[in-house]
């Protein structure tokens, strides 16, 4: 067991991150590690920047000189003696203020340059350290998230797109439910026309055998019924039938009842019942 463990550790070390880089990459990494130090001209400034008390004391000393020179200039102007020129106090005050301004600007610029150099070096150091811990292939989103200081987005498995097959019955039911309101009116009209044709066929008088009792007894009633139907306006009759068949409540019951009454009164129905 111990031998296997040692072999596994050796294999991990053999295939570790340091073995992922080529010879040229290792050389570049070594040079980058050597360049982590600041240039010689900025090393002293960096050492001084590490001790800000020294810079603050120097600036404070220059400020005291400037304040003293300005106060002396004001004093000499108020208490001016005959034959004493104000040029010397003015020159001293101007020199002190100029030195204070120049030293402040230089200190700010040097601190700014040192900050930029240190920032570059720290950035390169962090990126190289991050690259050493990664695999040979680095994802673009990982690099961007590291540089921007954000969490990388979740990785979705890039599975091949699957085609969703919808059964014909399901598709038909979906289409039917979505277009019920569109196809409802023609469907109702077809039912109404079908019921109207059935009613007209029932109302029409069918011929029976000449000389039969049924034919003789129902001849006068049929003739009167035909005359009454001719008097009724066809458009009114169609409108009434359409209204009956398009009605939502009890439509089919009323239609069946009316058709049954008409068929009962028809001569053909009487003939069949008597037979």
From Swiss-Prot:
Q: Cite the record's Polar residues compositional bias ranges.
A: 204-216
Question: Among its keywords, does the record have Nucleus?
Answer: yes
Conditions for induction: Induced by specific types of stressors like DNA damage, cellular starvation and proteotoxicity.
Q: How is it modified after translation?
A: Ubiquitinated by HUWE1. Promotes HAPSTR1 degradation through polyubiquitination.
List the biased-composition ranges (Low complexity): 172-181
Residue ranges annotated as compositionally biased, kind Acidic residues, are 32-44
Modified positions (Phosphoserine) are 167, 212
Q: How does it assemble?
A: Homooligomer. Heterooligomer with HAPSTR2; the interaction is direct and stabilizes HAPSTR1. Interacts with HUWE1.
Identify this protein by name: HUWE1-associated protein modifying stress responses 1
Organism encoding this protein: Homo sapiens
């Amino acid at each position: 067991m111990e031998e296997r463990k040692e072999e596994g550790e050796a294999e991990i070390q053999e295939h570790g991150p340091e073995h992922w880089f080529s010879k040229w990459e290792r050389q570049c990494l070594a040079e980058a590690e050597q360049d982590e130090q600041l240039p010689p001209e900025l090393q002293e400034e960096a050492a001084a920047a590490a001790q800000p008390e020294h810079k603050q004391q120097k600036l404070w000393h220059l400020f005291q000189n400037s304040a003293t020179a300005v106060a002396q200039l004001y004093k000499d102007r108020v208490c001016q003696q005959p034959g004493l020129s104000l040029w010397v106090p003015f020159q001293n005050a101007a020199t002190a203020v100029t030195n204070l301004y120049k030293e402040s600007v230089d200190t700010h610029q040097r601190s700014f340059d040192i900050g930029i150099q240190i920032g570059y070096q720290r950035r390169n150091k962090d990126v190289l350290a991050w690259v050493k811990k990664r695999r040979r292939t680095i994802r673009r989103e990982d690099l961007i998230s590291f540089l921007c200081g954000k969490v990388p987005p979740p990785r979705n498995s890039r599975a091949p797109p699957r085609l969703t097959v919808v059964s014909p019955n399901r598709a038909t039911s979906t289409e039917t439910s979505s277009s019920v309101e569109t196809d409802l009116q023609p469907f109702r009209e077809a039912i109404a026309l079908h019921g109207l044709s059935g009613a007209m066929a029932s109302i029409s008088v069918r011929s029976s055998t000449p000389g039969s009792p049924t034919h003789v007894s129902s001849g006068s009633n049929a003739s009167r019924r035909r005359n009454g139907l001719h008097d009724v306006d066809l458009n009114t009759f169609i409108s009434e039938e359409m209204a009956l068949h398009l009605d939502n409540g009890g439509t089919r019951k009323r239609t069946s009842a009316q058709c049954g009454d008409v068929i009962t009164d028809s001569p053909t129905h009487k003939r069949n019942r008597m037979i």
